[in-house]
Regions:
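Gly/Ala-rich beta-loop-alpha elbow adjacent to hydrolase catalytic centers
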Residues: 74, 78
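Patatin-like phospholipase
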Residues: 1-73, 83-324
């Protein structure tokens, strides 16, 4: 790793990469780092755009860096990808989008307007993550690296964090909640005394939340290129599904459009003197180019390309040679 230079797709403070390198060299493993730093991995959401982040997490794991983080934060698809890093399933995170999720069983626009959601979380949680890419949610209970899952309270659209849950059932419910969008991906999920929906509605990239939680270093994985974020006008006309959500709950449709929500945190991501950073070291990795993947893309070729681009972006940041 080179602390003096950042590759395309990497933006911010190379000290984050330097800390990763020092911890890997020390070899102490997750939860046993001897320095005084607190290194958070923050993974953005975005539906099928999560393929970019899946490739990034696979690259981090392949480089021996998965155990270097003190905590992982994620919203929606980012929470699922973050889970893969915590549990050592980086390869699955890279392949699940093109192998399993780019399908009509998971996303089928023909279900729009029926009683069945266009996006089937049942298929994801009860088939894909059981049969194809098995995930033991109970392993999160004893993980030395805590997972923080963002959810949105349905009643007031406020962001909340679910972490330190007692068992696998609770974790599975949290994962359903962080991806649930009424009319699109299923009804709100009841946890405790509240109903919860997709975490990216209120906080698609919880960098500020990780900083407020005490992180001294943050590596944020983006699922849009910088150009895609900057090019999204704040007054862009909302798609039909988002306007339908606004009729269900005023403001829900606008908040569910992750491009506009990401745009609101660009100043935090790009301004080293931003008051919310409080001297912390922050590095973002965004796809170095676009594969043309959107939130509901089901073209396996494009989705596989997004995973490959994510892997290449991390390899470039780490100074590793491009894969043949």
């Amino acid at each position: 790793m080179r602390s003096h230079s950042l590759s395309p797709g990497a933006h911010g403070d190379a000290e984050v990469l330097a800390l990763l390198e020092r911890r890997r060299t020390a070899g102490r493993g997750a939860g046993a780092h001897a320095d005084d730093h607190r290194l958070a991995l923050v993974v953005g959401g975005g539906g099928m755009r999560g393929a970019y982040a899946g490739g990034m997490v696979h690259a981090l794991e392949a480089a021996g860096l998965a155990g270097c983080f003190d905590e992982v934060w994620g919203s929606s698809a980012g929470a699922f990808v973050g889970t893969a890093l915590v549990l050592g399933h980086g390869a699955d995170a890279s392949r699940i989008f093109c192998d399993d999720m780019a399908s009509r069983e998971f996303i089928d626009p023909r279900r729009c307007g029926t009683r069945r959601p266009m996006v089937s979380l049942d298929h994801l949680l009860d088939h894909i993550l059981v049969e194809s890419k098995p995930t033991d949610w109970s392993s999160l209970v004893t993980s030395p690296v805590p997972l923080h899952v963002l959810v949105t309270r349905a009643s007031d659209l406020s962001a909340h964090v679910l972490t330190g849950l007692p068992d696998g059932h609770a974790w599975k419910s949290a994962m359903r909640a962080t991806a649930a969008i009424p009319l699109l991906a299923g009804p709100p999920v009841r946890i405790g005394d509240d109903d919860w929906i997709d975490g990216s509605v209120s906080d698609p990239l919880p960098v500020a939340r990780a900083l407020r939680g005490g992180a001294t270093h943050v590596l944020a994985l983006m699922t849009r290129t910088v150009d895609e974020l900057v090019a999204t006008p704040a007054d862009a006309r909302a798609p039909l599904w988002a306007r339908s959500l606004d009729r269900l709950a005023p403001g829900l449709g606008r908040m569910a459009q992750d491009a506009s929500r990401h745009g609101e945190c660009l100043s935090l991501l790009t301004d080293a003197a931003h008051p919310d950073r409080a001297g912390a070291h922050l590095l973002t990795l965004a796809p170095h180019t676009s594969a043309g993947v959107r939130g509901l893309t089901t073209d396996p070729g494009r989705v596989a390309a997004a995973s490959r681009i994510g892997h290449e972006t991390v390899d470039g940041a780490l100074g590793l040679p491009a894969a043949a």
